[in-house]
Regions:
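Rossmann-like NAD(P) dinucleotide-binding subdomain of oxidoreductase/dehydrogenase enzymes
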Residues: 4-148
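ATP/NTP phosphate-donor binding region
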Residues: 368-455
């Protein structure tokens, strides 16, 4: 229900207006992994923001992407969208996609793909939203709910056969719970490979010259990968797990694997676990995502501070947690920014907010006027904003009547009080009648005593002011 057209925010209290406009023509670059879902997502956020999009599909996914784009285009036109709201290059190539991104009619590039293609997007001289690779570490700390952590890991890593860039690529486990972890994973259909089997798997999965994943692996099940590697595993195998002692080029399977294959490390404690996770992120995963399973809030907070990742997923499956709005409040997205660490422009879960030009209209605000009798009295429209800056007020007692509440005037006062830096406490007494009697004063005084304010605000006419003055007097001088 987010508004993305015209006036999207009008703040009468601070006198500004925000107006949303589209960025313009979007060049959409899509990968061979998650091709159709990326097409659907980018088309939807462009439609929501009134930006036409022209796709350059990966040549290996041209047919399925075209099929998806045709369905979306036809549905959009049927709903009233312009005829050419969704377009694509019919004969794909790297050269054609590059020409699209550099075309003078394109206003912004929205790129998902290999690091080379994303780098090209940022080299066009146009605003670009590109995303980087995700070599995601998952740290399972000794205080974690281990059964749940294993379930989350399997759920995430097997989803779409591990094709999600936010899926866990390596699992790092405290050694004093490692045996229990292994037993749970074995019980749930995972297989730990021997050193010989790991070498066979490496030969099949990794290009020895480039040190990168062979394209034929992506999207295959654990059983298919094992068979292609010459490894015998049970037919119900969900994940292949490889024990590694290090990270980097000397350990080929420590790369992003985009498959139901996990590298596995054990560590002595959280300090060593953090360092291992940082190593994994630095090996072509910086800025993307890191995962921790723990019940220790201090450990979780420290992990968040130390990891160079735009998303820290806590006690959740990473694939589903990173894309947002399932296990957390993250913005739903299939385009996950990696920030400056990943050579991207944002760490956002890219969505409609990234595809809008927001114009801000700032109206003149009248300077507050005052005179001292003996303290300051502000008047003119907007004068209550001074409540944001008054010194030494922490507990505010508001005396008013029901009419002021219904008119929204009390809420205006509270609005400015809530903008203070000290998180002040507020109590409202709204039982002042047009002709208040002494009982009104006594009843309000009892509430005031319990609340112990250091400031009183009277809001309304003479009745509210008189009651407030009397209450404050008896509060300050209870012996009268």
């Amino acid at each position: 229900n987010q508004k993305t057209v015209g006036i999207i925010d009008k703040n009468d209290e601070e006198n500004y207006v925000k107006i949303a406009e589209p960025l313009g023509v979007v060049a959409g670059v899509t990968p061979v992994t998650n091709p159709t879902s990326t097409v659907v997502f980018k088309s939807l956020i462009c439609a929501k923001t009134r930006n036409p999009i022209i796709f350059g599909f990966h040549p290996g996914a041209q047919k399925c992407c075209t099929f998806a784009a045709e369905i979306l285009r036809d549905a959009a036109i049927k709903a009233g969208a312009p005829e050419n709201c969704i377009q694509w290059i019919e004969y794909p190539s790297i050269e054609a996609t590059s020409a699209l991104m550099n075309h003078s009619g394109v206003d912004v590039v929205l790129a998902t793909g290999g690091s080379g293609m994303v780098k090209s997007a940022y080299s066009t001289g146009k605003p670009a939203l590109g995303v980087g690779p995700g070599n995601v570490p998952c740290y399972i700390e000794k205080t974690s709910n281990l059964e749940r952590a294993c379930n989350d890991l399997i759920l995430s890593k097997t989803f779409d056969n591990g094709m999600i860039c936010a899926s866990e690529q390596s699992v790092v486990v405290d050694e004093n719970i490692a045996l229990k972890f292994e037993n749970i994973m074995l019980k749930n259909g995972c297989v730990f490979l021997s050193e010989e089997e790991s070498e066979k798997l490496t030969s099949y999965m990794i290009n020895p010259e480039k040190g990168t994943l062979n394209g034929v692996v992506a999207g295959k099940s654990a059983v298919e990968i094992a068979e292609s590697s010459g490894i015998d595993v049970p037919k119900n195998t969900k994940i292949l797990i490889v024990r590694l002692k290090g990270v980097g080029k000397d350990y080929p399977l420590s790369v992003e694997k985009l498959s139901p294959v996990l590298s596995y490390y054990t560590v002595k404690d959280s300090l060593e676990g953090f360092e291992r996770c940082k190593e994994i992120l630095k090996f072509n995963g910086e800025g993307h995502t890191a995962v921790i399973h723990s019940q220790d809030e201090r450990i979780i907070e420290k992990f968040g501070e130390m990891m160079d990742a735009g998303r820290i997923i806590v006690n959740s499956p990473s694939s589903q947690g990173a894309i947002g709005d399932i296990y957390n409040c993250a913005t739903p997205s299939l385009t996950l920014g990696c920030g400056s660490k990943g050579k991207n422009s944002t760490t956002d879960n890219v969505s409609v907010n990234n595809l809008l030009n927001i114009k801000r209209v700032f109206k003149r605000r009248v300077n507050m006027q005052w005179f001292k009798v003996p303290s300051k009295i502000y008047f003119e429209k907007g004068s209550i904003s001074y409540l944001e800056d008054m010194d030494d007020i922490n507990r505010i007692f508001i005396v008013t009547d029901e009419t002021m509440v219904k008119l929204g005037n009390v809420q205006k006062v509270i609005y400015h009080l809530n903008k203070r830096n000290n998180n002040c406490q507020i109590e409202v007494f709204s039982s002042v009648s047009p002709d208040p009697d002494v009982e009104t004063v006594w009843s309000g005084l009892e509430i005031m005593k319990r609340f112990s304010p250091d400031a009183v605000i009277s809001l309304g006419g003479g009745s509210a002011i008189d009651v407030a003055k009397a209450m404050w007097m008896f509060y300050e001088y209870p012996d009268l």
